[in-house]
């Protein structure tokens, strides 16, 4: 399936799920209606699920997408959004557990039923779909006439203390989201990415079953499992989700390829970047900036900290950052100033960062970044993931463990200064006639030792600047007292006959040659000769 066609449906459906449930309180009652179970309970643990995934990979793939009843197929987005799971049917609402589960209905874009199981004392039993568990709102449906075995589309988690607002949701293919202390959804994670950014169609694996382990009354963590399947690979996942200001997901995955996979994406992060300070190409909206995240943050295996601002390119852009045993990576929303977005409906300044922390050595490979052109803020056009160096082959077992952190800031930080803003525009000297085209970059760094250095006169802070082609001009690094940091400014003069991309690398160092800042990377594509205005 082609990514844009798929994401037109699934990512649009996520837009409103970060909002409180306006109907949730109306469903709250003291009476709890237990969910009906199907069949006999069976022994369950993660080893059993891994064997199930291994056996699945040894058989031909078959799609679980079903033809839905016409009324469900024809739902508008507003109609689908009005269908809500009833609080009196919530899983674990009749227990003392801190967590509860509510399910999503099939319909609109969601055609693949996901089987749901509850795990109690090591025994798993399937949960039955029940039309009476849903309030159909303004959808025009009342549940009558729907198949008894229709199934669920996904689920969301909330706490007993806040039944109207979920903190994590799993819906569509292998997508899931969570919130931190800001209580705002933003970017997504996925169980797996297959052939993202390649020349052919991308494959979107599905979680086909979830196993939800009933937590004890005093547990601050909920444990669940997912069975994943797709034409080229099957997998078993274990999630341990700790609800806190920075929400943590501890994930173990076991993957079993059916086919050789060209590009496997581990721990994929999916986000949106339409317009920002550094890239205003799509800036015709009245809002100054529109993005879920504004940069890729890397902590490499050799200890280097790297910041790569995101872009909304003219054409699909693919970058790989070679590494060995990475310490972490993620898509961050560093700009948290409401004035930079001016959107009091979706609150982009509150969107969570997502940080990936490998639990053990992942070996050689690369963090890969895919940036896709977009005209629409409901289309997720940014993907980052880990790609192992060796392509997976049938018969292998691939084990990856990692933690995901969702919150306003990543759980790790460097003692070095970091980039807080990247701005670009026409180069040259103000008041002087420009004789050729150049492009200006202004990069602001704060933190580390810079605040102290900015207060001292005659201190030498040197910018270290490299670029793959073209030449730099008017390079400077000076204190900027308004931010208690430094601003680096430079112009890039592209080759006259080339519109090839220019890779730029920058950091600040002191007189002893020691770095003062993280490494700032940028990829700039100059306009063709005929479009260079100066």
Swiss-Prot record:
GO cellular component: outer membrane-bounded periplasmic space
Pathway(s) this gene product operates in, as recorded in its UniProt entry: Glycan metabolism; osmoregulated periplasmic glucan (OPG) biosynthesis
GO molecular function, one term: carbohydrate binding
Database matches in InterPro entries: Gal_mutarotase_sf_dom (IPR011013), GH-type_carb-bd (IPR014718), Glucan_biosyn_MdoD (IPR023724), Glucan_biosyn_MdoG/MdoD (IPR014438), Glucan_biosyn_MdoG_C (IPR007444), Ig-like_fold (IPR013783), Ig_E-set (IPR014756)
Major localisation: periplasm
Post-translational events: Predicted to be exported by the Tat system. The position of the signal peptide cleavage has not been experimentally proven.
The keyword Isomerase belongs to this UniProt entry's keyword annotation: no
Subcellular location(s) per record: Periplasm
Pfam family, one: MdoG
Keywords, in A-Z order: Periplasm, Signal
Signal sequence interval, chain numbering: 1-28
A GO BP entry: beta-glucan biosynthetic process
Gene3D superfamilies: 2.70.98.10, Immunoglobulins (2.60.40.10)
General function of this protein: Probably involved in the control of the structural glucose backbone of osmoregulated periplasmic glucans (OPGs).
Family of this protein: Belongs to the OpgD/OpgG family.
Record-given protein name: Glucans biosynthesis protein D
């Amino acid at each position: 399936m082609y990514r844009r066609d798929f994401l037109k449906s699934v990512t649009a459906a996520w837009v409103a799920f970060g909002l409180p449930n306006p109907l949730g309180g109306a469903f709250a009652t003291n009476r709890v209606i237990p969910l009906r179970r199907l069949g006999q309970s069976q022994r369950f643990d993660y080893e059993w699920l891994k064997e199930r995934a291994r056996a699945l990979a040894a058989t031909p793939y078959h799609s679980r997408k079903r033809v839905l009843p016409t009324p469900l197929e024809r739902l508008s987005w507003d109609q689908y959004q009005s269908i809500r799971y009833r609080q009196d049917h919530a899983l674990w609402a009749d227990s003392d557990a801190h967590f509860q589960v509510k399910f999503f209905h099939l319909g609109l874009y969601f055609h693949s039923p996901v089987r749901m199981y509850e795990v109690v004392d090591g025994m798993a039993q399937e949960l039955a779909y029940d039309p009476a568990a849903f309030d159909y709102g303004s959808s025009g449906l009342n549940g009558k006439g729907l198949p008894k075995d229709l199934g669920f589309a996904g689920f969301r988690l909330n706490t007993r203390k806040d039944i109207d607002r979920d903190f994590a949701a799993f819906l569509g293919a292998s997508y899931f989201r969570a919130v931190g202390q800001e209580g705002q959804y933003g970017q997504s994670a996925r169980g797996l990415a297959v052939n993202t950014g390649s020349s052919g169609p991308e494959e979107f694996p599905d979680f086909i079953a979830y196993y939800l382990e009933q937590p004890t009354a005093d547990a601050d963590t909920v444990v669940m499992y997912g069975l994943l399947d797709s034409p080229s690979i099957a997998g078993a996942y274990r999630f341990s989700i700790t609800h806190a200001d920075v929400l943590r997901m501890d994930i173990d995955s076991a993957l079993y390829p059916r086919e050789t996979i060209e590009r496997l994406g581990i721990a994929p992060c999916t986000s949106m970047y339409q317009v920002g300070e550094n890239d205003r190409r799509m800036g015709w909206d009245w809002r100054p900036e529109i993005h879920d995240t504004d940069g890729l943050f890397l902590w490499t295996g050799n200890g280097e900290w790297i910041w790569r601002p995101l872009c909304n390119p003219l054409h699909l852009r693919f970058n790989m950052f070679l590494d060995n045993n990475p310490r972490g990576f993620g898509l961050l929303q560093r700009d948290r100033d409401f004035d930079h977005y001016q959107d009091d409906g979706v609150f982009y300044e509150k969107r969570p960062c997502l940080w990936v922390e490998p639990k053990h050595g992942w070996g050689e490979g690369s963090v890969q970044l895919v940036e896709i052109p977009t005209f629409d803020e409901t289309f997720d056009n940014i993907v980052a993931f880990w790609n192992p160096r060796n392509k997976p082959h049938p018969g292998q077992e691939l084990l990856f463990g990692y933690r995901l952190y969702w919150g306003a800031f990543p759980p790790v930080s460097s003692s070095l200064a970091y980039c807080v803003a990247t701005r670009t525009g026409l180069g040259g000297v103000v008041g002087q006639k420009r004789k050729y085209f150049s492009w200006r970059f202004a990069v602001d760094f704060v933190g580390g030792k810079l605040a102290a250095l900015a207060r001292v006169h005659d201190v030498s802070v040197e910018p270290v600047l490299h670029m793959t082609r073209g030449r730099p001009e008017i390079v400077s690094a000076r204190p900027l007292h308004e931010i208690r940091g430094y601003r680096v400014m430079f112009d890039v003069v592209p080759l006259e006959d080339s519109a090839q991309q220019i890779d730029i690398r920058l950091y600040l160092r002191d007189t002893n040659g020691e770095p003062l800042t993280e490494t700032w990377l940028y990829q700039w594509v100059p306009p063709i000769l005929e479009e260079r205005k100066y």
